[in-house]
């Protein structure tokens, strides 16, 4: 769903007037953010839209796509446009938890030796966890704690991460050798799973011209980190219609085999989404409405975000693999079935 600006209504109530101003600011900032990222990234409009939603909701996002589709460039461009500190961790089989979180090191001060904490690369506002499924479960667990608690624990001491703190991870869907399956608990911590597809023929021509011209366009700064935090604090206050909440809950519950009347769910899903799916979907719908400049999130916003908010929370059966049924097929079937 493409994002566009829409009119809003100003009211005499001071609190509502402030929210109306923030709504306009959010819509304008996101339009400028898309333009800034578009100066570097060709196409991928839907991907950019979904990552902006993740940013506004303070959520983590999992980007799935084959190598060479500019996933790293996209995330780093977002960080530059938002003036956020950026960290990249290349996940490998020999990566240790301390390589991510940091470690205590022995230092000498005033003639005395003491342990001091040396922060790892995760102590940034926006962290790219590249090929997250290439590292063992122990290291994945360290990242999970940081994503969940926005803090890391080393040597019995807890160190808070900077605010905002968000993880955008990547996963290569075609290489399985030497990889470790992401546990459901970790997948559930991602607000959205965003699939990055191949560019169109015309977009690929533009990419070929732009990347071989010898020049590298700069990404303009759109927002400062404190301005982003202000917009993030505003998103939960965006109104949402009862129909939208009802649809989000029904869609989530319809992914569970014991409760669903969908043949696709009963035949191909072992476990459906938990309540966190409903929460992520409603919050994403609020962000989507704010980006478009709408005063309240509605059914259309829920439908637009249903696939990225729910697909990674489904555990498909072996039969689904045999029959070639994907998570997107199941979510599409559920969307057709559920009405409000």
Question: Language-model segments: what does each one mean?
Answer:
Residues 3-17, 24, 259-340:
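C-terminal engagement/docking regions of AAA+ P-loop ATPases
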Residues 19-27, 40, 179, 193-265, ...:
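Conserved C-terminal "switch" segment of AAA+ ATPases
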Residues 23-66:
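Pre-Walker A (pre-P-loop) alpha-helix and adjacent loop at the N terminus of AAA/AAA+ ATPase modules
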Residues 50-53, 107-128:
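Conserved alpha-helical scaffold flanking the Walker A/P-loop in AAA+ ATPase domains
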Residues 55-93:
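Walker A/P-loop
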Residues 61, 127, 165:
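Conserved beta-strand position immediately N-terminal to the Walker
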Residues 66, 100, 170:
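P-loop (Walker A) phosphate-binding loop of NTP-binding proteins
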Residues 107-112, 131, 135-139, 147-237, ...:
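Canonical AAA+ ATPase core
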């Amino acid at each position: 769903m493409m994002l566009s600006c829409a009119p809003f209504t100003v009211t005499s109530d001071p609190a509502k007037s402030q929210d109306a101003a923030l709504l306009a600011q959010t819509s304008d900032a996101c339009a400028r953010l898309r333009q800034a990222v578009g100066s570097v990234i060709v196409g991928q409009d839907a991907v950019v839209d979904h990552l902006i939603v993740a940013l506004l909701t303070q959520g983590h996002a999992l980007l799935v796509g084959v190598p060479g589709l500019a996933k790293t460039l996209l995330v780093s461009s977002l960080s530059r446009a938002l003036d956020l500190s950026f960290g990249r961790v290349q996940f490998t089989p020999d990566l240790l938890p301390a390589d991510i979180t940091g470690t205590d090191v022995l230092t000498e001060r005033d003639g005395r030796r003491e342990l001091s904490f040396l922060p790892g690369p995760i102590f940034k506002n926006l962290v790219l966890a590249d090929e997250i499924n290439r590292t063992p479960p122990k290291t994945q667990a360290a990242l999970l704690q940081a994503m969940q608690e926005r803090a890391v624990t080393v040597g019995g001491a807890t160190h808070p991460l900077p605010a905002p703190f968000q993880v955008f991870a990547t996963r290569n869907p075609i290489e399985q050798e030497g990889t470790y399956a992401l546990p459901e608990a970790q997948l559930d911590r991602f607000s959205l799973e965003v699939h990055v597809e191949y560019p169109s023929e015309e977009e690929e021509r533009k990419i070929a011209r732009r990347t071989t011209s010898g020049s590298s366009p700069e990404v303009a700064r759109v927002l400062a980190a404190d301005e982003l935090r202000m917009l993030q604090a505003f998103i939960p206050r965006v109104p949402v219609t009862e129909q939208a909440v009802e649809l989000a809950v029904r869609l989530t519950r319809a992914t569970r085999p014991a409760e669903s009347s969908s043949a696709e769910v009963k035949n191909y899903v072992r476990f459906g989404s938990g309540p966190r799916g409903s929460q992520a979907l409603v919050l994403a719908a609020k962000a989507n409405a704010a980006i478009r400049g709408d005063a309240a999130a509605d059914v259309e916003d829920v439908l637009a975000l249903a696939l990225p908010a729910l697909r990674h929370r489904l555990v498909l059966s072996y039969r689904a693999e045999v029959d070639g049924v994907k998570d997107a097929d199941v979510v599409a079937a559920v969307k057709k079935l559920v009405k409000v």
